UniProtKB/Swiss-Prot annotation:
Short name of any one Pfam family annotated for the protein: Sec23_BS
Gene: SEC23
Residues the record lists as binding Zn(2+): C56, C61, C80, C83
Family (UniProt): Belongs to the SEC23/SEC24 family. SEC23 subfamily.
Cysteine pairings via disulfide bonds: none
Topology class, membrane: Peripheral membrane protein
InterPro entries tied to this protein: ADF-H/Gelsolin-like_dom_sf (IPR029006), Gelsolin-like_dom (IPR007123), Gelsolin-like_dom_sf (IPR036180), Sec23 (IPR037364), Sec23/24_helical_dom (IPR006900), Sec23/24_helical_dom_sf (IPR036175), Sec23/24_trunk_dom (IPR006896), Sec23_24_beta_S (IPR012990)
Described purpose of this protein according to its UniProt entry: Component of the coat protein complex II (COPII) which promotes the formation of transport vesicles from the endoplasmic reticulum (ER). The coat has two main functions, the physical deformation of the endoplasmic reticulum membrane into vesicles and the selection of cargo molecules.
Localization terms from the record: Cytoplasm; Cytoplasmic vesicle, COPII-coated vesicle membrane; Endoplasmic reticulum membrane; Golgi apparatus membrane
Protein name as it appears in the record: Protein transport protein SEC23
Gene Ontology annotations of biological process type: COPII-coated vesicle cargo loading; intracellular protein transport
Keywords carried by this UniProt record: Cytoplasm, Cytoplasmic vesicle, Endoplasmic reticulum, ER-Golgi transport, Golgi apparatus, Membrane, Metal-binding, Protein transport, Transport, Zinc
Amino acid sequence: MDFEQNEDINGVRFSWNVFPASRTDANKNVVPVGCLYTPLKEREDLAVAGYNPVVCGNINCKSVLNPYCEIDVRSNTWTCPICKTRNILPQHYANMTQETLPLELTNTTVEYITSVPVQVPPIFFFIVDTTAEEENLQALKESIITSLSLLPANALVGLITYDNVIQLHDLSSASIDKCNVFRGDREYQLAQLVEMLTGEKLNAAQAVNINAPTKVTPFSLNRFFLPLEQVEFKLTQLLENLKPDQWDVKSGFRPLRATGSALNIASLVLEGCYKNVAARIILFSSGPGTVGPGLVVSPELKDPLRSHHDIDSDSAKHYKKACKFYNQLAQKVADNGHTVDIFAGCYDQVGMSEMKRLTDSTGGVLLLTDAFSTAIFKQSYLRFFSKDEEGYLQMAFKGTLSVKTSSDLKLQGLIGHASAVKTKTEASNVSDSEIGIGGTSSWKMSSLSPRHTYAVFFEIVNPGASAEVMTDRPKLAYTQFITSYEHSSGTNRVRVTTVANQMLSFGNPAIASSFDQEAAAVLMARIAVDKAESDDGADVIRWIDRTLIKLCQKYADYNKNDPSSFRLSPQFSLYPQFTYYLRRSQFLSVFNNSPDETAFYRHIFTREDTTNSLIMIQPTLTSFSMEEEPQPVLLDSVSVKPNTILLLDTFFYILIYHGEQIAQWRKAGYQDDPQYADFKSLLEEPKLEAAELLIDRFPLPRFIDTEAGGSQARFLLSKLNPSDSYQSGAVAGSTIVLTDDVSLQNFMSHLQQVTVNGQT
């Protein structure tokens, strides 16, 4: 079964491609029935229909016409495979033949360009922290000014700058600089802000219709958002004239920085005039919030920033209060249909751990860099505005993902950058048991891109111990993903993907053969990361171990109490090592990482597809030598040899490691001697391959060039399986890794032992 082909066509990968026929049987499988779905996956041959989709008339279904529907040409009707309702086809579908079938009856994934145009262009609201040092602020200003040329000419733009006060800039005046100034230590409310900025009191009736488009006047709230083509010169001038915060910072104190208040004011201004309109709040922060709501740390330097240990031991003084503030703000921003992006440019933590819900529930970007002057920030920020072949931004707005299922399936939840859509009546295909964001069959993505991938989990409805599937035709479970969104071209679009999975009785060998161990590993990793947000890290590791043992007991071949007889079929053989590397990954092992770094790593992991997620779990290692062609090698200390160059890709950084002998030759300058042209080309090969990896990676990875004995070689050694550690003898020519971590060999040996002994 070609799992990757299905992903290329439909953007979906299931853990089990054949489903057990009952819930009891599915529970025995240990790994839940789930899939990784990339709604806007790029395809050259995507079927695009320039008309509205045909929708099922059942008000509780509303699924879309697809290739699995039964068509009755004589009566011009179609039967919905999801709910079995019979529907009348539109008149222009009459008299169709096998040769003239519409796109939606021949393609499992179709994109519809609907007839409803987008009313308001996207809004980009920049929030700039001016407490940055001069060099850092200068680099940031240059990046923002450059990015203006990448925005659509009709895009609306706004600007807030802040230190311990918040300045909301009015771009409507070309001759003078006007701005409204707010206190940074206060949490403003919507009615209060509207009255201050417009002079009008906001009553309940106005609050309901607050998003009604109004003409821009000198006193209207929407005067703060004007078309880029009108105000680009003014905005560029304002940015160029920005100076670092003029307030004196006393010795032993941090700058006063009202980040929480700035974000709150930005969300309120947008809510006041552009609720449920595509908008991005883009924050550039150069340090932690030290004043006002959402305060991360006090201004005094003697008060250190919280660590993981402080958070776990409940001794992080401001953490819970800040999290509560930002979580409530995130819910409000998501409800308004807006997105928050956070770009950090400083060596210190800025409070990403507290603010992560702002980006994770709105489809925003969280980027952690050392400074705004680094290549990582500059190039990642510009890639944020990357465009497709037609010149449109590769970002979609106001997305909604609805998942329709046939009566055999219910939805447990979704793990990804989204928020639940609140509905008046609960959909019939929603399970009582939740994984991730549950209790609904529709999720809201204020923003999404071709990279965004969501983990969706299902429950088999039939509770029977072993439901027999005894029919002439194979029993199929149908799932339809309907993604509605605003395309950056100004059109409303609907991407529909419909898939069918066979259901068989437990024990049928087709179920085991349908196991996609790569997708399963990523789905289980997403559950583990989701659990790690609220559970103790050691408990999450134990849960991972127990599920692996149970899966092996179910699907490995072995004789009881005989570890040497343990065998896993090819469909399962890589799964244990994925689990081993997941246990050691920065997503679960937070030792040596700050809370902000952990938030950043988990944010990126929960938005990427199967391939990129696996690179994060188990990095790839490629060996280059004079004797052999470049080849993948084990992520193991035995792969480190004096006469090879290694290329490590962890997704977050790309490292080139020169073995001891290679490093000596390089220092001696052999590559500059024409006699050693082969050696010169050997040094260039990994750089060329690294450049290939960097082409479309977001965010831009850190690039490390090191050698045996170099200080940065630790970045490689920390990722390797320590089969040669100080506790064991080293293989000749390999490297000893100084660690107390269990090696993969010992991990597998213990797994085999507990599996064959019947332990859990």
